[in-house]
Amino acid sequence: MFTIRHKGLRISPSLSATRELMKEGKTLFDVLEILEKGYDAPRKRKHGIIEKWINKGNKTYNVVVAEDYDDIMKEDIWKLIHFGKFTRRRIK
């Protein structure tokens, strides 16, 4: 079965994150690109949670994933808990 993996763990979106991806017209391949090529967010997160940002044009996309365990597949996964976009502003 074909799955998208980051650091050896499968990426599985939550229901709300799936809705956020659909709203922006993005896929898990875009999430993987942000996780691999993006930079760390300026704010701190708990241990086991990763937040990455990537700039595209005047927009910044952010991804938040947390380490989790999938009871059905019996494996550790990255649970996508947030996907967002915001506009960067120039500082005057």
Features from the language model and the residues they span:
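Ribonuclease/tRNase effector modules and their secretory precursors
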Residues: 1-92
